[in-house]
């Protein structure tokens, strides 16, 4: 168990095997199967839940492993142990923690400043700001920015194969400029965004460009030493999109600079979301605002509770246990619904 290993004193190093290229890799591949080096267990999913319906073996692989160790007298004791385990919130299938190279934002460098700025925000209830959110800030870790997915904003980072040279692209204009250098150097045949006009903000012009992964991954840039540079394959955490909303909605800094720089539209006077956003939108807004502008992203915030179903579970579309609020209002009226919510909630 990775968590137990990391918490041990001294820390237990991860178990790795060497792949065909001699690189140390985990025992399990990215599909959740044991690697070929694992002999009789190779190709088996580490969790029965990963199999298609009707394909899972009678004994899961962890049971097979336990039996093998006991049979070969290599285990002191084998017993069942009931414990909590993280599941995917979309599929309800078990999650595997997998060691991958990632890009991080060094939030820990501004952790104290984030806490200072949070004390200037008017939280309702105050306990959420000083307690749940405040404690989250005090224990904030560096932000894992990259995601190994297909849909999302691509990391605008191009690197040489040896990783010694890299470039971070900050605008389409800069990307087109670098593509021209790449074409001139012969590492690209053409500028794939040649028809796009810099400075033309019309929809017609932006129909000529596509910045999604399947397109930008075709772009090869050239380093200062003349080496080809490929884009880092990962995407950006979607919470970074949400946290950038105050500036991105105005196409800042390419347009409407005064709205942000002169505080016409920033920071927000008021925002409201559920208490679960202390680790989501509230946090990403605050983190980016602190790092980019040394400012709060919002002055006042109302953090409401969550509506639970009859079994005490949070209502959600995924679980299908939500009550249509408009049908409730139509049947009982707004005042009766308000009174019901207030009288059945903690003060």
Model-derived regions: residue spans:
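Non-cofactor substrate-recognition interfaces
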Residues: 1-280, 284-347
């Amino acid at each position: 168990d990775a968590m137990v290993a990391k918490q041990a004193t001294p820390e237990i190093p991860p178990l790795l095997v060497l792949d065909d290229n001699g690189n140390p890799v985990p025992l399990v591949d990215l599909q959740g199967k044991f690697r070929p080096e694992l002999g009789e267990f190779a190709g088996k999913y580490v969790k029965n839940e990963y199999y298609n319906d009707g394909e899972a073996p009678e004994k899961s692989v962890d049971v097979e492993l336990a039996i093998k160790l006991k049979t070969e007298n290599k285990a002191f004791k084998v017993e069942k142990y009931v414990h909590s385990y993280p599941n995917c919130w979309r599929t309800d299938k078990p999650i595997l923690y997998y060691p991958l190279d990632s890009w991080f934002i060094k939030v820990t460098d501004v952790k104290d400043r984030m806490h200072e700025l949070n004390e200037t925000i008017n939280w309702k209830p105050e306990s959420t700001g000083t307690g749940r959110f405040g404690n989250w800030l005090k224990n904030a870790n560096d932000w894992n920015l990259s995601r190994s997915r297909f849909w999302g904003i691509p990391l605008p980072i191009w690197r040489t194969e040896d990783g010694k040279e890299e470039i971070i692209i900050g605008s389409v204009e800069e990307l087109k400029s670098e593509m021209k250098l790449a074409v001139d150097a012969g590492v690209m045949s053409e500028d794939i965004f040649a028809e796009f006009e810099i400075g033309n903000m019309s929809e017609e012009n932006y129909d000529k460009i596509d910045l999604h992964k399947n397109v930008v991954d075709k772009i090869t840039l050239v380093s200062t030493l003349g080496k080809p540079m490929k884009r880092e394959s990962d995407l950006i955490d979607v919470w970074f999109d949400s946290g950038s909303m105050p500036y991105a909605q105005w196409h800042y800094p390419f347009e409407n600079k005064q709205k942000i720089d002169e505080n016409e539209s920033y920071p927000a006077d008021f925002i409201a979301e559920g208490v679960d956003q202390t680790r989501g939108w509230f946090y990403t807004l605050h983190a980016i605002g602190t790092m980019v502008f040394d400012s709060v992203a919002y002055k006042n915030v109302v953090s409401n509770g969550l509506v639970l179903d009859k079994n005490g579970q949070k209502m959600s579309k995924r679980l299908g246990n939500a009550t249509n609020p408009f049908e409730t209002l139509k049947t009982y009226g707004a005042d009766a619904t308000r009174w019901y919510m207030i009288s059945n909630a903690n003060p």
